[in-house]
Amino acid sequence: RPKLPHRHPEIIQNEQDSREKVLKERKFPSFALHTPREEYINELNRQRELLKEKQKDEHKEYLIEDPEQQESSSTSSSEEVVPINTEQKRIPREDMLYQHTLEQLRRLSKYNQLQLQAIYAQEQLIRMKENSQRKPMRVVNQEQAYFYLEPFQPSYQLDVYPYAAWFHPAQIMQHVAYSPFHDTAKLIASENSEKTDIIPEW
């Protein structure tokens, strides 16, 4: 391990000072110079305080000028209409902000009302569609009536078809001819049963 030569702190301090001098001579901007953080924060705080003082002074000057203008306007016998631009200049910043927020609130309420009206109109359209689907229109022509759907389509009546007819799909069953059911209480026999000796089948 090679040992680094011991450097005196005085020499290091002198080197830093010489660097700052060189940077200043070259006319670098102030942000390029190495400044500790605390100094930078203190500088920002000073600038902030100066700005606040300037604003307070402007406000005081405005308050002082305002009563003088009121007195001069009251002494004048003829009433003059003040233009809108001068009135707006007299309004302090807080009042301007207040008016701006009021205007934003009005716009927002207007926008919300328009949205509510649009939602209400959409709901009415949906209700009208539902009602028209529940009560289909009466159509004289049967071909036109085919296009209107009924809410409950009639189910297949099982007593009309033979046993297990419901098992087959409707498309197949429409081509098959069905014989109607016979009453089981009646005897199945030919008309000549009196003449022949055939026993009727149950």
Curated annotation (Swiss-Prot):
Top-rank lineage group of the source organism: Eukaryota
Q: Where is the composition biased (Low complexity)?
A: 70-80
Under InterPro entries, the record lists: Alpha-s1_casein (IPR026999), Casein (IPR001588)
- One GO term of the biological process aspect: response to estradiol
Q: Which GO terms describe its cellular component?
A: extracellular space
Return the annotated region ranges for Disordered: 1-25, 51-84
Subcellular compartments: Secreted
Quote the Pfam families the UniProt record gives: Casein (PF00363)
Keyword tags? Milk protein, Phosphoprotein, Secreted
- Name positions with the PTM Phosphoserine: S18, S72, S73, S74, S76, S77, S78
Its tissue distribution reads: Mammary gland specific. Secreted in milk.
Composition-biased stretches, type Basic and acidic residues, lie in 16-25, 51-63
Family listed? Belongs to the alpha-casein family.
What PANTHER family does the annotation carry?
ALPHA-S1-CASEIN (PTHR10240:SF0)
Something else known = The sequence of variant A is shown.
| Function as written in the Swiss-Prot or TrEMBL entry | Important role in the capacity of milk to transport calcium phosphate.
Q: What name does this protein carry?
A: Alpha-S1-casein
Q: Could you tell me the gene encoding this protein?
A: CSN1S1
